[in-house]
């Protein structure tokens, strides 16, 4: 069983150009099984990477330090390098699970950078997939219930109220991609957002654009891994919070029957396939559209009618609105529907509104986006500091003095144009005023327009796509790779 299990879990591509590998091991059954499975598999490789086991001590329970020490002893017995990293500082009182997840990945990434590792593996299992699906599905059903109540309120009383309520509810659920009769999530080719979420945890992702994150156990049940450990006569640590019903995941776990578990596992697989196909369809659509991004402004020329009616078109519009506005999250399906309803590409007059941090201007020639002027703040980037400004620019100050970052001023823009003899056709100052400006006591720069070496400060600037910068799912890679060149702005001083 051990050999067969290990042979089915890993791909040849998992270890390509990998000299050092970080394994996240807490001491629980899932991660401990991962450790021994990887150890066994690497024996089959001619040039295996070096294993470095990392245990994250979240310091949320008194037992956590002792548990980390137990993992260290296991690694020492098997001659494997081991590191303990700790989540320091004050812990949040709410959303502790999600906050711990972010902290955990940040700590793993930092250790990977420190060790020169290009790959992190974690022990997420099929149980994690199924539980995640069920939690997200239940939230969708709650949203559907809210819609039903809103629809009834809109219809009012009367003999036809129930019929009207059902029709309105079904119509709104149809727009959201949620089944309107308490059934499954509607399987629609254009249900972009909800199938996206129900695809759950991807096998592979890219952490901070540099380190691969692979979860090879996603297709394996937890009990299978525990059987594997028993056969190897290995014991694992039981986390008491796994039985604490104050946590949503525990309640969901305890409610899942074997038959339902199998059914949900199949749905996760189908949703993942659909999400990857949708990503490819969106990538093809973006390539078919006439899109330009320059000087803080994105413009989508009015597409042919069949492209406007493409099921992915609302997603593309929402995507560029978020990216130009510096948002960290893609728009949910309900907001995409609202956004598309606001657009009329048949109007001869220019119309304008703000959405997702962007100004969106449209008429029969197309759609323009730029960062709205509201809530753009100035900041000081100290020497040696890396700072994310406005959700759009990552700035690293390599100089020996602080710099100020903020939006370009109108006076500075006009002066720059005059002194550098710029000839920008159809200059659009509202979008230019959203560009990053860097200044100190020696002067200022607007790096996307000009860079003044005379300022004698050294900086690195990178235009980021915030929803994908921290963690990019392989399921989204198809369209992200197509969008990336539009925002491939790098300045090195």
Swiss-Prot record:
Q: Which keywords fit this entry according to its UniProt record?
A: ATP-binding, Cytoplasm, Ligase, Nucleotide-binding, tRNA processing
Q: Would I find Cytoplasm among this entry's keywords? A: yes
What is the main EC category here?
A: ligase
Gene3D superfamilies assigned to the protein according to its UniProt record, in alphabetical order: HUPs (3.40.50.620)
Cross-referenced Pfam families: ATP_bind_3
Q: Tell me a Gene Ontology molecular-function term this record carries.
A: tRNA(Ile)-lysidine synthase activity
Question: Which NCBIfam families did the record assign?
Answer: lysidine_TilS_N
The family annotation for this protein states: Belongs to the tRNA(Ile)-lysidine synthase family.
Designated name of the protein: tRNA(Ile)-lysidine synthase
Source organism of this protein record: Bartonella henselae (strain ATCC 49882 / DSM 28221 / CCUG 30454 / Houston 1) (Rochalimaea henselae)
């Amino acid at each position: 069983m051990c050999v067969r299990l290990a042979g089915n879990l890993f791909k040849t591509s998992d270890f390509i150009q990998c000299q050092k590998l970080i394994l996240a091991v807490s001491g629980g059954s899932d991660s401990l099984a991962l450790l021994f499975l990887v150890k066994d598999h690497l024996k089959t490789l001619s040039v295996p990477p070096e294993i470095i086991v990392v245990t994250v001590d979240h310091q949320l329970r008194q037992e956590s330090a002792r548990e980390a020490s137990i993992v260290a002893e296991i690694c020492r017995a098997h001659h494997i390098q081991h590191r303990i990293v700790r989540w320091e500082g004050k812990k949040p009182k709410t959303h502790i699970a999600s906050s711990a997840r972010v902290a955990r990945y940040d700590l793993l990434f930092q250790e990977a950078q420190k060790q020169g590792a290009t790959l992190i593996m974690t022990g997420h299992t099929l149980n994690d997939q199924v539980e995640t699906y069920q939690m997200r599905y239940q939230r969708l059903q709650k949203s559907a219930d809210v819609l039903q109540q809103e629809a009834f309120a809109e219809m009012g009383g009367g003999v036809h109220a129930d019929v009207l309520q059902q029709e309105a509810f079904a119509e709104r659920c149809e727009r959201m991609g949620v089944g309107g009769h308490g059934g499954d999530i509607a399987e629609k080719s254009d249900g972009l957002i909800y199938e996206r979420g129900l695809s759950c945890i991807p096998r592979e992702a890219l952490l901070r654009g540099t380190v691969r994150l692979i979860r090879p156990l996603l297709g394996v049940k937890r009990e299978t891994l525990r059987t594997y450990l028993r056969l190897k006569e290995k014991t694992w640590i039981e986390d008491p919070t796994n039985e604490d019903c104050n946590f949503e995941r525990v309640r969901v776990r305890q409610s899942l029957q074997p038959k339902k578990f199998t059914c949900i596992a199949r749905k996760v697989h189908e949703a993942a396939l659909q999400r990857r196909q949708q990503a490819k369809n969106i990538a093809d659509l973006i390539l078919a559209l006439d899109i330009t991004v320059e000087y803080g402004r994105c413009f989508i020329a009015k597409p042919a009618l069949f492209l406007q009616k493409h099921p992915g078109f609302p997603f593309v519009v929402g995507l560029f609105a978020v990216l130009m506005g510096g948002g960290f999250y893609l728009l949910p399906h309900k907001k995409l529907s609202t956004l598309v309803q606001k657009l009329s590409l048949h109007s001869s007059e220019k119309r304008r509104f703000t959405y997702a941090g962007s100004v969106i201007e449209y008429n029969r020639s197309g759609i323009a986006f730029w960062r709205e002027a509201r809530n753009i703040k100035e900041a000081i980037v100290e020497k040696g500091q890396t700072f994310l400004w406005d959700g759009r620019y990552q700035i690293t100050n390599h100089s020996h003095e602080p710099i100020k970052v903020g939006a370009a001023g109108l006076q500075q823009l006009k002066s720059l144009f005059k002194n550098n003899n710029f000839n920008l056709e159809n200059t659009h100052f509202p979008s230019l005023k959203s560009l990053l400006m860097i200044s100190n006591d020696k002067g200022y720069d607007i790096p996307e327009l000009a860079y003044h070496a005379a300022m004698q400060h050294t900086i690195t600037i990178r235009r980021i796509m915030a929803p994908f910068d921290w963690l990019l799912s392989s399921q989204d890679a198809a369209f992200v790779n197509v969008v990336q060149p539009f925002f491939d702005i790098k300045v090195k001083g």
